[in-house]
Amino acid sequence: EGQPFMTTSCCPSYIQLVKKHIPEMEKYVSTTLSPMRYTAEIAKEKYPDCKTVFIGPCIAKRKEAEYSENVDFVMTFEELGSILDGMEINLEQVAPFQIDKEAYLSSHGYGSTGGVTKAVVEHLGGPEVNALLLSNLNKKNIGLLRAYAKSGKCPNQFIEVMACENGCISGPVTRIDKATAAKVYTKELAKMATQREQK
């Protein structure tokens, strides 16, 4: 509150970048935990003896899990895919899942560029946010973040930062290429929206 701008906090690679290389940015980073940590916290409250496993396209989640007593294991899509292949399980033949109709539909879009910003705007129910979307922690974008942190000034009030180009859907341990991932993701979000309308 009262800061000239704020950045997202859900990408663990970005958080490590700030801690190690741009400490001046730390005060501008949201204190909101990532969905992985909130979900694990809820699971442990509801089922105290359970073991929680985060499955995703991100290796950096392993580092983030070290900061949470609620996340027991982290598995990548590549690892899960290898297990499914080894057990000869074909996901195309598995019954489709039903989405939680109480959840914000936009929260399912977190994994792609602009998804976090959209979810924030929907949750607040206010006007559009003047956001900068940085979904590639290359030299240019790191330099930009460093400049904003050191000057304390940014033309945008909100910066959504994701280490991977196009967001988490292009994470380093997915099993499909970026273009296919984006198509599948968009298709699944549309399917979820249709399911919501039918409820």
Region annotations inferred by a language model:
Residues 1-199:
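Iron-sulfur-associated redox domains of electron-transfer enzymes in respiratory
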